[in-house]
Regions:
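Structured-RNA-binding interfaces characteristic of tRNA pseudouridine synthases
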Residues: 2-273
């Protein structure tokens, strides 16, 4: 099994730097993850990497190896994903490649930009990734946004959500927030920022109350954001205390944390280099 160093990113699976005579290219893309078994190519399953790789091979007439900033899990969305590849051609016409890719890809995947990159650029080497998780705190069903939010039933203390999020920033062992006990060389990560804020729009139905959790880190552990969100909701609904949250984090034990939030509420929203 490959070791990973962020959310689904395998350290032993990496695109090579471009050798002499080959071009390096960057792809910016967005996708709705509902219909996919995540980013990573998996035999027998529909994945974003699988479809994108097939489309690129058709256009370039050669197989390519993709690197990606955030290797999203099944059902997770990405509104600001970055991928890269190297190929024999250095004279690609970016707009034509973008149009051709979008013609071949399904409507829930969109390539927003194709651009030449400096030799040595590899998408997975991002400095930081930002994820956002959306909660719907209303008795009114989120019909329009049902594929992008977690509709939480029952009262939620948003003040406790905010206090729980304040425990996350910093550099420490986050092994309590992943079910993957033997997947990583190190479980130490640095969370740069984390916080909740109301995200209700003026066009919401009566009783509408949407809250969004935004977190930025250099890299993430598998399911780290979803376990954090699920546990914070448990705190906000009285199933565990802030002290138990902090103690579970310090102990590094997944069994002491709360539920795992559904994938549909999570999206990759920014990548920095």
């Amino acid at each position: 099994m490959n070791a990973r160093d962020d959310t689904g990113e395998a350290t032993q699976v990496r695109a090579e730097d471009a050798p002499p005579g080959r071009g390096t290219w960057r792809l910016d893309l967005a996708y709705e993850g509902t219909a996919y078994r995540g980013w990573a190519r998996q035999p027998g399953h529909r994945t974003v990497e699988g479809l994108l790789g097939e489309a690129l091979a058709t256009i370039l007439r050669e197989p390519v190896r993709l690197s990606v900033a955030g290797r999203t899990d099944a059902g997770v969305h990405a509104w600001a994903q970055v991928a890269s590849f190297v190929c024999a051609r250095r004279d690609l016409r970016p707009d034509r490649v973008r149009l051709s890719l979008n013609a071949l890809l399904p409507t829930d995947i969109a390539v927003t930009a194709v651009s030449p990159a400096a030799p040595g650029f590899v998408a997975r080497r991002a400095v930081s990734r930002t994820y956002r998780y959306r909660l719907w705190l209303s008795p009114v069903k989120p019909v329009r946004d049902r594929a992008y939010v977690w509709n939480v039933r029952g009262a939620v203390d948003t003040g406790l959500l905010q206090r729980a999020a304040a425990l996350l920033p910093g550099r420490r062992d986050f092994s309590a927030l992943t079910p993957s006990a033997h997947l990583y060389h190190s479980y130490v990560r640095e969370v740069l920022t984390a916080g909740w804020r109301p995200a209700a729009g003026d066009d919401g139905p009566p009783g509408h109350a949407e809250w969004a959790f935004t977190i930025t880190a250099g890299s993430f552990l598998h399911n780290m954001v979803r376990v954090a969100v699920g546990t914070m909701v448990d705190v906000a609904q009285g199933r565990m205390t802030l002290e138990e949250f902090a103690e579970g984090m310090a102990a590094g034990e997944r069994r002491r944390m709360g539920q795992t939030a559904p994938a549909r509420g999570l999206a990759l929203v920014a990548v920095a280099y």
